[in-house]
Amino acid sequence: MKPVSLAKYIQKSPFLTKLLLPISNAYVHLSGYRKYGLRYDDLMLEENDDTQKALSRLPKMESYDRVYRIRRAMQLSIENKILPKSEWTKPEEDYHYLRPVLAEVIAERKEREAFDALIVKKPETQAHATSSPAHAH
């Protein structure tokens, strides 16, 4: 069963968006990943095959920056420190750089699976449908 998501419904409604945006911003702030200089997409698990393929499609500089942010965050976590507030990830810097690529990879995989499951049947022709005179006795 596919999980239910209200995100699209909320985004279509200006009232709900305005109502829930402060809650969303508070949640992002409390999650704390920006205090370590991370972006939201940095938190995606790499163990997934689709994510691995999406990561391999990132531009070199974006991939390098991602690894740097993760290593710096791990070092800060080991030292029980956070970045100075001036170095926290700002909301305008926290854009989705991996999610669009991942969506493309997943769509390609689903399309490939659909074609792999496709059964090709040879259509019967009229010549095969009627018995040939050689077999009629």
From Swiss-Prot:
UniProt-annotated location(s): Mitochondrion inner membrane
Pfam families: UCR_14kD
Keyword annotations: Electron transport, Membrane, Mitochondrion, Mitochondrion inner membrane, Respiratory chain, Transport
Recorded GO CC terms: mitochondrial inner membrane; mitochondrion; respiratory chain complex III
Keyword presence, Membrane: yes
Keyword Transport: yes
Assembly, per entry: Component of the ubiquinol-cytochrome c oxidoreductase (cytochrome b-c1 complex, complex III, CIII), a multisubunit enzyme composed of 3 respiratory subunits cytochrome b, cytochrome c1 and Rieske protein, 2 core protein subunits, and additional low-molecular weight protein subunits. The complex exists as an obligatory dimer and forms supercomplexes (SCs) in the inner mitochondrial membrane with cytochrome c oxidase (complex IV, CIV).
Function: Component of the ubiquinol-cytochrome c oxidoreductase, a multisubunit transmembrane complex that is part of the mitochondrial electron transport chain which drives oxidative phosphorylation.
Protein name listed in UniProt: Cytochrome b-c1 complex subunit 7
Organism field: Schizosaccharomyces pombe (strain 972 / ATCC 24843) (Fission yeast)
Gene name for this UniProt entry: qcr7
